[in-house]
Amino acid sequence: MKKIIKLFQAILNIFIFLALYYILSFIGSLLFLLFCCFITKTPLRLLPPNFIDSNFFMIDGFACFLTLLVYLLIYKLKKYNKNRYINKLPRKDIPKYALISMGMGGLSALWLIFADKILSSITIVKNSLQNFSQISESLNNEAYIFIFLSVILFGPIVEELLFRGLIFNEIDKIKGGAAPIILSGLLFGLFHREPVQVVYASILGIILGFVYSKTRSVPLVIFMHMLNNLVATLPPPLAKHEILQFVNGFQIISVIPMVYLLYKLYKKGSLTS
């Protein structure tokens, strides 16, 4: 009976954590809009119809900042892994984890190539690729500083606190081993909603979950997530065709050492030589 109660409590907590994301995102976005109305002395109803779309990353960055404060508070109060708590960046091994992050980007690139070349005849994949392309193009419509804050800085912190810091540990309390790695990874994938993103985000989530299971370091998986997003959204001066081609090629090549490093982490529990 106690196991059933613990299971339902974990499921309820996970539901609350996920619901909080959408609630806080809405509140944060609304507060930002009201602030804009106050500064410009414009009634909310008179804001341009495309105001949210044209300022999406600026609004999302503010909402993410609010959300991460709440998640950080919950994470601290929960005191997960109290007796085996390792929450520091393993500085000597940072280059190796950075290489794993690059390999994660390589897997994403390979999946998108496969989806585009092989699966694009499937309607849902074709539509999803088009939507994904539109999302990518929207990155050109705002100042890079807001994209940086939303996609590279605050976004990864929020998502890692949510999926590795909170959800992973809730599942781990019920069932250890591969269960929290896989389930938190799949939820991370579904969280991204767009079908082509769901696939590679699930794979990335499972890899990040595996790294977290071995290191118990939230800052480490935040770093890996940030690096992955940074390489995917380079600043305009670096977003040249030749540079992007080189980066994509390096990411794909990095898949090989990534597999080796993950195997080493699996066998030894550390990447330290």
Q: Which residues does each PLM region occupy?
A:
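Functionally important transmembrane alpha-helices
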Residues: 18-22, 26-30, 34, 185, ...
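Membrane-interface helix/loop boundary segments of multi-pass membrane proteins
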Residues: 158-183, 210-217
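Hydrophobic alpha-helical membrane-insertion segments
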Residues: 14-28, 96-113, 210-213
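Hydrophobic core of alpha-helical transmembrane segments in multi-pass integral membrane proteins
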Residues: 63-73, 102-110, 153, 249-267
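Alpha-helical transmembrane segments in multi-pass membrane proteins
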Residues: 21-78
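Membrane-interface capping segments at transmembrane-helix boundaries
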Residues: 75-82, 262-273
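Juxtamembrane helix-loop-helix connectors linking adjacent transmembrane helices
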Residues: 42-53, 84-155, 173, 242
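Hydrophobic alpha-helical transmembrane segments
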Residues: 11-15, 57-58, 95-102, 145-149, ...
